[in-house]
Amino acid sequence: QTGAKAPRKALANKAARKTAPADGGVKKPHRFRPGTVALREIRKYQKSTELLIRKLPFQRLVREIASDYKSDLRFQSSAVAAIQEAAEAYMVGLFEDTNLCAIHAGRVTIMP
């Protein structure tokens, strides 16, 4: 009976040594392989329909550009929302076309 208990204890010690980190008890944070998080984000944003540019910074940009043409312009909130919707749709289409061009040329990275 005593002979059977000793190996179990040795196995338990061996398993404990394997799971314990080698650098004195400080565990490294978990990291995904390169590209995994990017693919997950691509799937997430392709499923979603909400606007991705923050509303207030976009509104400030619209007002700044419009002030170059005419001062003291006022905007309905629905007009700014329509401009933002169109701008984001245009940018998504542009990135889709850019990605197709990069794939065609045998590249992965797109650059401005």
From Swiss-Prot:
Keyword DNA-binding annotated: yes
Span list, region Disordered: 1-31
Subcellular compartments: Nucleus; Chromosome
Pfam family, one: Histone
Molecular function in Gene Ontology: DNA binding; protein heterodimerization activity; structural constituent of chromatin
GO CC entries: nucleosome; nucleus
Keywords linked to the UniProt accession: Chromosome, DNA-binding, Nucleosome core, Nucleus
SUPFAM superfamilies: Histone-fold (SSF47113)
SMART domains xrefs: H3
Statement: the UniProt record of this protein carries the keyword Nucleus: yes
Subunit composition and interactions: The nucleosome is a histone octamer containing two molecules each of H2A, H2B, H3 and H4 assembled in one H3-H4 heterotetramer and two H2A-H2B heterodimers. The octamer wraps approximately 147 bp of DNA.
Biological role stated in the UniProt entry: Core component of nucleosome. Nucleosomes wrap and compact DNA into chromatin, limiting DNA accessibility to the cellular machineries which require DNA as a template. Histones thereby play a central role in transcription regulation, DNA repair, DNA replication and chromosomal stability. DNA accessibility is regulated via a complex set of post-translational modifications of histones, also called histone code, and nucleosome remodeling.
Family: Belongs to the histone H3 family.
Protein name per the record: Histone H3-4
